[in-house]
């Protein structure tokens, strides 16, 4: 039995949900699964927008067949060639051998690398501003390189004013029946996972996202259909504003992310005491993370949310605690910029981590490391409270 959803009189969702997956891209925890979205548009000609992960090809083709309702497929629009979206292309072509594939020139090259069928005889390479008429619906192709692969484009349907946005505006998480964002009561949970998705999957490519947003600003958009998660038909300015902030590395809130690496609890205590002192200074929505318990993707997402970060690490084998080292290098790799940072180090005989953490932060753009820091020798002493107060004062001042 098929599982398709009618979005408009002519547009159908034919995607799938994956609740068995534990790690997206074999890296990122997805406790609520993933959706792989695909869409069928019916007109005088028919079009399928992207495919799905290879694990779900059978169910996906059932959905496509049901949406086409006895018709053939004229066009396969390939916005993105990452395998969670392109893996079923060969199966679609086998089922609909007359279908033409519309994609960028770079996508043609990638398709030849992934598949063995004759791509050239089927491909229609498109460039910026090219159009394709399906009848009463006209598609315009908008190039979106490095959002987040080089071959990416998005497709705008101008009659119903729908943007097929590839990986942009997506989120972690399967679709739980309610396929439209306005059907979800808990937008806070969605936002948290959307932020984590953006910052970890697309976050490095902020300038490219900014370029796409500028192009999108010139389009009248009534619906956004991403390749992951829910579809947007309301609150589009709110959604786009989030992307404007994230892609420009602008903090959402003037508050603090605290991450600590601790073995026996002494550095953890320092992080907790500092968090309390920051709260006493009127700072709200502080986050505190144990880098050994919380996956880096959650901490990276929170660092994009906040304007200041505190890194508290023990000295471990003469260096930064291993999980803290991973977090710092991941933050650098994801391009986070325009933040204030503060450091706490702990070492029983040779505390070295403030210098080492500072060196990693120094490779990042516009990260201001506060001069006030705290060195713990094994355990905090009562006479160090003034140092924590000074650090809290400096952090609070940076938020003004």
Label each PLM-derived region with a short phrase.
Residues 5-9, 103-152, 211:
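Metallo-beta-lactamase
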Residues 225-252:
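Short N-terminal or domain-adjacent regulatory/targeting segments
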Residues 175, 186-224, 229-231, 273-289, ...:
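FMN-binding flavodoxin-like domain, especially the glycine-rich phosphate-binding loop
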Residues 148-152, 168-203, 247-251:
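Active-site-proximal loop/helix segment associated with metal-binding centers of metalloenzymes
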Residues 45-47, 75, 137, 161-164, ...:
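Structural motif
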Residues 49-51, 73-81, 101-104, 163-166, ...:
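Active-site neighborhood of phospho(di)ester-bond hydrolases with catalytic His/Asp-centered motifs
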Residues 4-65, 154-157, 161-165, 267:
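Conserved beta-strand hairpin/beta-sheet module of binuclear metal-dependent hydrolase folds
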Residues 44, 55-102:
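Active-site metal-binding motif and surrounding structural segment of the metallo-beta-lactamase
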């Amino acid at each position: 039995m098929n599982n398709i959803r009618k979005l408009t009189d002519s547009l159908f969702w034919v995607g799938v949900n994956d609740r068995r997956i534990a790690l997206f891209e074999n890296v990122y925890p997805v406790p609520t699964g993933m959706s792989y979205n695909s869409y069928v548009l019916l007109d005088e000609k028919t079009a399928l927008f992207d495919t799905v992960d290879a694990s779900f090809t059978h169910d996906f083709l059932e959905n496509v067949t049901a949406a086409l309702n006895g018709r053939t497929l004229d066009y396969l629009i390939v916005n993105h060639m990452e395998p969670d979206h392109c893996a079923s292309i060969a199966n679609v072509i086998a089922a609909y051998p007359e279908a033409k594939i519309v994609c960028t020139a770079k996508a043609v090259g990638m398709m030849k690398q992934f598949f063995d069928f004759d791509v050239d005889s089927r491909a229609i390479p498109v460039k910026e501003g090219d159009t394709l008429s399906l009848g009463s619906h006209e598609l315009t192709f908008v190039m979106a390189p490095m959002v987040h692969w080089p071959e990416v484009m998005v497709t705008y349907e101008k009659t119903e004013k729908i943007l097929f946005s590839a990986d942009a505006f997506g989120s972690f998480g399967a679709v739980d029946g309610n396929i439209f964002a306005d059907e979800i009561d808990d937008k806070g949970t969605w936002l948290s996972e959307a932020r984590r998705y953006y910052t970890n999957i697309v976050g490095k490519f902020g300038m490219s996202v900014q370029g796409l947003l500028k192009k999108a600003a010139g389009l009248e958009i009534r619906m956004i259909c991403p390749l992951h998660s829910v579809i947007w038909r309301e609150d589009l300015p709110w959604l786009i504003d989030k992307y404007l902030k994230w892609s420009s590395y602008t903090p959402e809130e003037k508050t603090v992310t605290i991450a600590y690496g601790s073995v026996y609890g002494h550095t953890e205590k320092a992080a907790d005491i500092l968090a309390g002192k920051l709260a006493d200074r009127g700072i709200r929505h502080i986050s505190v993370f144990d880098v050994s318990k919380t996956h880096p993707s959650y901490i990276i997402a929170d660092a994009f949310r906040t304007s200041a970060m505190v890194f508290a690490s023990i000295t471990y084998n003469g260096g930064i605690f291993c999980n803290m080292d991973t977090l710092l290098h991941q933050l650098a790799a994801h391009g986070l910029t325009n933040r204030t940072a503060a450091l706490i180090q702990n070492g029983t005989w040779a505390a070295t981590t403030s210098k080492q953490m500072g060196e990693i932060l120094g490779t990042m753009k516009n990260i201001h490391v506060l001069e006030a820091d705290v060195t713990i020798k094994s355990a905090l002493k009562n006479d160090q409270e003034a140092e924590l107060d000074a650090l809290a004062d400096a952090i609070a001042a940076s938020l003004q």
